[in-house]
């Protein structure tokens, strides 16, 4: 939180851009940022095309009396498209005349707060959300280059999370940690597969819903010697 640092790295497999530094030197607020892109998305690789990138960000806001607040987020995009042999005379295997695609999206973000008490104790609370999506499919070609789909997948998952942890150091040898987590989970799934070649897709799994999960824990650590 004292000075800005910026970094750009270029390698065989990707590009990495990072930056960190103060948002406000007076209030000691700071940020950290990182972005990566895989150069495989720019290359014509045998067998398919891959494209990957991710982004990470965290903002830190310490206060004099109310503890430290932080806002964070992370996300990624991962894509793959396979190549198929367009020359039918070179078809030797079933995979030579099939083309598949996969797209994966993931994101998470939240707000955290940490407060330190005067008795060697701290309380950390986080409210967060996560999201993931997988979109995939596969297509089969015949010798006339007519295509028919034989698999289609679309799944989405969303989690809303609230978690808090109380940590207390009673002595150099004894520490106790207590906390709980509440998660509300949402899902949507659509999966269809063709039972045989050139036949229409049939639904294998389809549905959506949500459920909740509560978990609590208490743990203690005892040291055999003074730290």
Predicted regions and their residues:
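Glycine-rich, flexible loop segments associated with nucleotide phosphate handling
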Residues: 28-32, 95-98, 150-152
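Flexible, solvent-exposed coil segments and beta strand-coil junctions
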Residues: 1, 34-43, 50, 83-95, ...
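Face-selective signature of the C-terminal outer-membrane beta-barrel domain
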Residues: 60-78, 100-227
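Short, solvent-exposed beta-strand edge segments and adjacent coil->beta transition regions
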Residues: 3-5, 54, 96, 108, ...
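Predominantly transmembrane beta-strands of Gram-negative outer membrane beta-barrel pores used
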Residues: 1-49, 54-62, 70-74
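A short, polar/proline- and glycine-enriched secondary-structure boundary/capping micro-motif
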Residues: 18-20, 81-82, 135
């Amino acid at each position: 939180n004292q000075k800005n640092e910026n970094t750009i790295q270029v390698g065989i497999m990707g590009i990495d851009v990072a930056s960190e530094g103060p948002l406000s030197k007076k209030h000691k607020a700071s940020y950290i940022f990182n972005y990566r892109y895989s150069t495989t998305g720019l290359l014509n690789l045998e067998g398919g095309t891959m494209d990957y990138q991710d982004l990470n960000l965290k903002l830190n806001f310490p206060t004099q009396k109310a503890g430290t607040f932080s806002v964070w987020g992370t996300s990624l995009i991962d894509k793959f498209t396979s190549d198929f042999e367009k020359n039918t005379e070179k078809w030797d295997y079933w995979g030579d005349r099939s083309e598949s695609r996969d797209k994966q999206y993931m994101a998470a973000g939240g707000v955290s707060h940490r407060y330190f008490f005067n008795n060697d104790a701290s309380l950390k609370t986080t409210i967060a959300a996560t999201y993931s999506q997988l979109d995939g499919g596969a297509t089969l070609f015949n010798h006339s280059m007519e295509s028919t789909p034989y698999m289609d997948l679309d799944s989405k998952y969303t989690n809303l999370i609230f978690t808090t942890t109380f940590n207390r150091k009673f002595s150099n040898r004894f520490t106790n940690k207590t906390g709980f987590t509440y998660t509300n989970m949402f899902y949507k799934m659509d999966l269809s597969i063709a039972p045989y070649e050139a036949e229409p897709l049939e639904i294998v799994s389809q549905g959506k819903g949500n459920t909740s999960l509560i978990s609590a824990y208490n743990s203690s650590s005892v040291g055999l010697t003074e730290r």
